UniProtKB/Swiss-Prot annotation:
Region described as Disordered: 147-177
Pfam families per record: DUF134
PANTHER family xrefs: PTHR37478, UPF0251 PROTEIN TK0562
Name of this chain's protein: UPF0251 protein Cag_0886
InterPro entries registered for this protein in UniProt: UPF0251
Length: 177
């Protein structure tokens, strides 16, 4: 289990779709000798918007629902990982990140409900008080806003319902020609 980190919580990043292919492996390298570079879904989305679609950073940032400087940092991180993998002959696997799976399906307003991620108990949201500042009386865990974004741990169950994003099950899935 990952430790909770101090500081500001990461905001949701909006992506248009989850990746259909989650790992890319260089050919000519023994599978057991390949190192991995782990790239997040939001880094891939930033590269898609800026590099493939040719959007300006400000426009792409609006689509991902992040600030322009944050978009730049996400894009830089993704490009650095891809360059490292290409130069070093490493496998690129795409998994995780704090994302909203599909932007078009997101309701414009979130429900006024705080949810315990451990036991699933719901509490009414108090305007002006972030859900994360309230504690579940049963589990002693911080609450989350219902309908909020998916972090690495929270998305595992929901990803399985939509489309599995993770490491391949077999070597055949690793081969990209």
């Amino acid at each position: 289990m990952r430790k909770k980190r101090a500081g500001r919580p990461q905001h949701c990043r909006c992506v248009q779709d989850l990746p259909k292919v989650t790992c890319f492996t260089p050919s000519g390298v023994a599978p057991e000798a390949v190192e991995q570079v782990l790239m997040t879904v939001d880094e891939l989305e930033a590269m898609r918007l800026a590099d493939r679609d040719g959007l300006y950073h400000a426009d792409a940032a609006m689509q991902m629902k992040v600030s322009r400087p944050t978009f730049g940092r996400i894009l830089e991180s993704g490009r650095r990982k891809v360059a490292d993998a290409l130069v070093g002959g490493k496998q690129i696997c795409i998994k995780g990140g704090t994302v909203l799976a599909v932007c078009d399906s997101i309701p414009t307003e979130r429900p006024d409900i705080c949810l315990c991620p451990t036991c699933g108990r719901e509490f009414p949201h108090i305007k002006g008080v972030p859900c994360r500042n309230s504690i579940c009386p049963d589990c002693n865990e911080p609450l989350q806003r219902k309908g909020g974004c998916l972090s690495d741990e929270e998305s595992d169950e929901q990803e399985n319902e939509q489309r599995t994003v993770g490491y391949p099950e077999s070597e055949e899935e690793l081969e990209i020609e």
